[in-house]
Amino acid sequence: LVILVFVLNAFVFFLFFSLSHYLGKFLLVLFFMINSVAVYFVNTYSVIVDESMIGNVFNTNYEESSSYFSFKLILYIIILGVLPSVYIIKAKIINVTLKKGLTISSLALLLTIVLVITNASNLLWIDKNSKQLGGLAMPWSYTVNTSLFYIHKYKKNEKEILLPNATIKDNQKSVVVLVIGESARRQNFSLYGYDKNTNPLLSKKPNVFHFDATSCATYTTAGVKCILEHTNSDDLYEILPNYLYRNNVEVVWRTSNWGEPPVHIKNYQNRDVLRKDCKGEGCDYDEILLTGLKEQILASKKNKILIVLHTSTSHGPTYSKKYPPRFETFKPVCNSVELGKCSQTELINAYDNTIVYTDYILSSVIDDLKELKEFKSTMIFVSDHGESLGEKNLYMHGVP
C-alpha cells in the first residue's frame, strides 16, 4: 500500500509538472509544508486526518491553536517542510519529450494496476479500514477531506427549516441554564463511579441526577449542533436557542468557547463582552461565564428564560492552564503540550483537575439559581464530546 500511494503521488505530480514547472514546484512546496504539520499531529497525538478532524482545524481560533506550539513542532516543520522546500525551489527541472512523458505515465499506471491486483486479497480489509487509511495518506487526506468539509458545510448553511410554533401555557417565571461542557467525559466524574473525588461539591447537592449520554461527533460544531437539535437529521432544522428566541423566550448565550452552529439571538456574549464587568482571578477562566448572571436573569422582562453557558474547561492539550491554581487537587500534573512526554498519572491528574473545576462552576450555578426564589429553575449539563487521555496511544480527539 505504501508503494501504491508513492506511485500514485509520483504520477499525479508528474502531470502537474507537465502542465507547468512553476505549478508543480508551488504545489510540492505547499504540500511538504502542510504535510510536516499534519505528520506532527499524527505522530504526537495519534489523530486521523479525516473530515471531522478538518472540522476541528477550521473551527479553532488563535488561543487554541497557539496552545499546540512546541519546539518539536518547529523541528518537524524545518526538517520535513522547510528543507525539502528549499531543495525543490533550487532544483533544476529536466524537460522530457512527449513520447517519454507518455511512456512514464503509462508505466506508472501499469504499476498501479499491478499493485492493485497484487493486493486484491486485502481489498476487504482495505475497505473496512478505508477511513483510517485515507486519513493517513498525505496529502490527499487533508485535500480531499477539506473539499468534503466545505461541500457539507455549504449544504448545512442553507436556510433553516422552521419547527412548529411553540405554545406557552403559563406565566410562571422559569429559567433553564444549559451548561455545555468541552471534552468532559463521564468516565472521570465521580458521580458516575470514578474512584477519584472529582465532584466534591455536586455529590453533596440534593436533587442532582446523572444520566448516560453519547456524543454525536468529536468536534465542537457537530457535537453542539447535535445537542441543540430536536432530532438527529442531515436536514437543517432550527436549533433550540433559535427556536425559543423566535417564540418570544428570553435566550442568552454566554461563551468562553467557539465553533457553535449559527445562533440567531440578540444576547450573544463572548469572553470579551463578559470581561468588561468581571473582576478577580476567575475572569481568566470559565468562571467569567457567571459574571452578573443572576442580575441578568432578574433584569429580564420575560417569564421564560434560557441561559446557555458554553464552557471550554477541559479542552486540551494545556489542561493544567484551564483552571485556577487553587483547583489543582491532584498532583503532579502534565504541563507540556506534547502529551506523550507526560506520564499517564500526570496527564490524568491535570485532566481530572478540570473536572474538579467544572464541578465548582456547576455547583455555583445551582447556588445562584437557588437565590432566585420567584423562579422555577433547572440546570442541565452535557458535554459536546469526550476526550482520549493516552489510551492506546490516543490523545484529545484522537479517534473521530
Which residue stretches match the model-derived regions?
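Catalytic cores of PAPS-dependent sulfotransferases
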Residues: 18-24, 45, 243, 247-253, ...
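Active-site-flanking alpha-helical
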Residues: 189, 366, 391
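A long, amphipathic alpha-helix that forms part
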Residues: 14, 134-140, 291-294, 333-379
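Short, motif-level signal for alpha-helix interfacial/capping segments enriched in acidic residues
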Residues: 16, 90, 97, 103, ...
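Juxtamembrane/transmembrane-helix boundary motifs at the membrane-water interface
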Residues: 1, 218-221, 342, 346, ...
